[in-house]
Structures are given as structure tokens and as C-alpha cells.
């Protein structure tokens, strides 16, 4: 064999082998290039709920692209965060998305994000209303059971214990429902009393609402912090609380508001109120005097009455309590005794005393003051001494 021929055969170029072997690396390169693009497409559905935190369900029906939701999730936003955000905060979030990721948001996506969040808020609100409706229905049945005569309250207490044990926290719901039920009863009484005289109706409403505001869930007088401190006449109070001169000035403001309400009623041809009623308090609130409210003014009206009927006794009482450092609650209770003494000298008719005074005629006499006068009159009638009713009540 020729050695040159053997050597030449080793280096002979065969175009068929070149054509058959050359294209083989290209599919590998194509597979390598195509594989990364197809693999995430098959992997995304399994990772959607875990990666986006529910954003895909929130934005799915509003034309939001998947990658837009993914970018929002990368910024750390969740469904709960977006629902609690305001509109301007959502605008800042979308602007940050465009600036940080250079991601162009479509106009429809901007509106779609806000629309999806509003829809989610409505859905959550509806679920909360339904949940509260179920709780209030259960607690209303429990309260109705207590309202029946002859029934024990042990089943109701047992239900409350079971609800507390299950983590329902229905004790607060019970208190809210009971307060709501009381107010509904008051409204029904008002509807029945519409045929009565306007003044008597208004007075009954005030007494009932005083009982509601003064009683807690379990009944009894609610202990509230007094917003005033005992001050001497013309003394300026220091600190967060106001003095008694400011308290008496509030009653003068109520008189001015009553005059304005009467003028408006005359212009409209309506019935003019002759006393400070709910209509006056509502007008004061609309006028910006929200610090004037009925519970406060009814609570200290007898103190203002003593100030108007006998200013010297009122000032002396204020000085004495200021020197002893007593609070305004004790001063308020002490104001009853001089008023009972004044009523004893004028036939025990506290309403006539109020109506005869120009500054007190617009106020209803306190129920407690009437009760004290009635009790003192009975004691005076049972006593053999004519002056017993006044001598045992020195200031």
C-alpha cells in the first residue's frame, strides 16, 4: 500500500460528513436559547398565588398585565396594603413603579388599579356588615330573653360566656345593641307623645335622655369627669379645665341662640320654642358652638339658677369650696340646699320660681330639685313647727 495514499486519506475532506455534522450543534444552541423562555411560562401558574400575595386575583378582571402586578409585588405591596392606601398614595406608588423599574403603565392600568382596589374595599365592607348583622341578631335575641318577666338570665349569661370563650368578643356588641335598643324605645315614646303639648313633650325627652346619658349598661349613674373646676367670682381658671364664670356664660350663650331660633321660626311661620330645647342645641352645634350640649347644660342648670336667684349665696358657696379645695362635683351637690330653702319661702313651687325669673324662664326645672322640694314639703307638713322647713336648712 502506498503510504502517501494512506496519509492523504486521513486528511481527505468529505463534504458529506461536513454537511451532516455541522448542523448538529445549532439545535443545541437553539434549545438552550429557547428553553429559558418556555420554562417560566410553565412555572408561573404554580408560583402566582405565592409570589404576588393575591394581587393576581385582585387585578385579574381589570386588564392589569401580569408583569405590572409582579412589579408591584416586588415593591413590597400586598392586597391589604393597597386597600388601606389613599388615592394620592396609590398615585405615588404608580409613579414609583414607573421611575424605579422604567415600567410604562398603560392609562387603563392606572384606572384599573384604582377600580380594583375600590371594588375590594366594597367587598370587605359588605362582609363586615353581614358579620355584624349576624352578631347583632344573636345579641338582640339574648337581650329580648332578659326583657321577659319571670325568665332567668342564666341562659343569657351562659351565651355570653360561650361567645367569649370562642373568641367572638361579643361583650362590646352586647353593650352597643342594648344602648341602641334603649334609644329606639325613646323614639317610640316620642312618636306616641306627639299629640301632647310641645313643652311637656320636650321636657319628657330631656329627662329620658338624661337617664340614658347618666346610666351605664348595668344601670345607675355614670361617673363622668367634670370639665370645670371651682373658682371664685372673676377668677380666671388655669390649666385645661374652665372656671365657673365660663360655665355661667354658656347659659347666657344658650339664651342668645334661643333668640336666634325664635327669629328664624317667626320668619318661616313655624312654632317658636319658648324654652331651650333640642332645636336650640342643634342650632348651636351648626353655628359652631359644639361645646354647648344638652347633658352638660342640664347637669348644672340648678347651679346657674342659684347664681341668678341669690348671687351672694352662690359666690359665698364658691369661695368656701375653693378654700377647702373640693371639686366641682361636691359644689354642684351643695347648690341644691339653698335652692330648696328658696323654694320653701315661695310655696315649694320650683317651676313657678323658674318661670318668674327672666333668665331662668327658658330652662326646665331639674327633676331632682322637684323631688327634694316635694320631700322637704312633706317633712314640713308632718312637723309641728311651722318654721321647721326653713330652719333646718341653713346655708
From Swiss-Prot:
The record marks 271, 278, 282, 329 as: Interaction with DNA. GO terms for cellular component: nucleus. Highly expressed in leaf, leaflet, inflorescence and lateral shoot primordia on the main shoot axis, and in floral organ and carpel primordia. The keyword Nucleus applies. May regulate indeterminacy during leaf and flower development. Belongs to the FLO/LFY family. This is Protein UNIFOLIATA. The gene is UNI.
Amino acid at each position: 500500500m502506498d503510504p502517501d495514499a494512506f496519509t492523504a486519506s486521513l486528511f481527505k475532506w468529505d463534504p458529506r460528513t461536513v454537511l451532516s455534522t455541522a448542523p448538529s450543534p445549532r439545535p443545541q444552541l437553539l434549545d438552550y436559547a429557547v428553553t429559558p423562555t418556555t420554562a417560566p411560562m410553565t412555572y408561573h401558574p404554580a408560583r402566582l398565588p405565592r409570589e404576588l400575595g393575591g394581587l393576581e386575583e385582585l387585578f385579574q378582571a381589570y386588564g392589569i398585565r401580569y408583569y405590572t402586578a409582579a412589579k408591584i409585588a416586588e415593591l413590597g405591596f400586598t392586597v391589604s396594603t393597597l386597600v388601606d392606601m389613599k388615592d394620592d398614595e396609590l398615585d405615588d406608588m404608580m409613579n414609583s413603579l414607573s421611575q424605579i423599574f422604567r415600567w410604562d403603565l398603560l392609562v387603563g392600568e392606572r384606572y384599573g388599579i384604582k377600580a380594583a382596589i375600590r371594588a375590594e374595599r366594597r367587598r370587605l365592607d359588605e362582609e363586615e356588615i353581614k358579620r355584624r348583622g349576624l352578631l347583632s341578631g344573636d345579641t338582640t335575641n339574648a337581650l329580648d330573653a332578659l326583657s321577659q318577666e319571670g325568665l332567668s338570665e342564666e341562659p343569657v349569661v351562659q351565651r355570653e360566656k360561650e361567645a367569649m370563650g370562642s373568641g367572638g368578643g361579643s361583650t362590646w356588641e352586647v353593650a352597643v345593641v342594648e344602648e341602641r335598643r334603649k334609644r329606639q324605645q325613646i323614639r317610640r315614646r316620642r312618636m306616641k307623645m306627639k299629640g301632647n303639648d310641645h313643652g311637656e313633650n320636650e321636657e319628657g325627652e330631656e329627662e329620658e335622655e338624661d337617664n340614658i346619658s347618666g346610666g351605664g349598661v348595668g344601670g345607675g349613674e355614670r361617673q363622668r369627669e367634670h370639665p370645670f373646676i371651682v373658682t371664685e367670682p372673676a377668677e380666671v381658671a388655669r390649666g385645661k379645665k374652665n372656671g365657673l364664670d365660663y360655665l355661667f356664660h354658656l347659659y347666657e350663650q344658650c339664651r342668645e341662640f334661643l333668640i336666634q331660633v325664635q327669629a328664624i321660626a317667626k320668619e318661616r311661620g313655624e312654632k317658636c320654642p319658648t324654652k331651650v330645647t333640642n332645636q336650640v342645641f342643634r342650632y348651636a352645634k351648626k353655628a359652631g358652638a359644639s361645646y354647648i350640649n344638652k347633658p352638660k347644660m342640664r347637669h348644672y342648670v340648678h347651679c346657674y339658677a342659684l347664681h341668678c336667684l341669690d348671687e351672694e349665696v352662690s359666690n359665698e358657696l364658691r369661695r368656701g369650696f375653693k378654700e377647702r379645695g373640693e371639686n366641682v362635683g361636691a359644689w354642684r351637690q351643695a347648690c341644691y340646699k339653698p335652692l330648696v330653702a328658696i323654694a320653701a319661702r315661695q310655696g315649694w313651687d320650683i317651676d313657678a320660681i323658674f318661670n318668674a325669673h327672666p333668665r331662668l324662664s327658658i330652662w326646665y326645672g331639674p327633676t331632682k330639685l322637684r323631688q327634694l322640694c316635694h320631700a322637704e314639703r312633706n317633712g314640713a307638713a308632718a312637723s309641728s313647727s311651722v318654721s321647721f322647713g326653713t330652719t333646718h336648712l341653713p346655708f
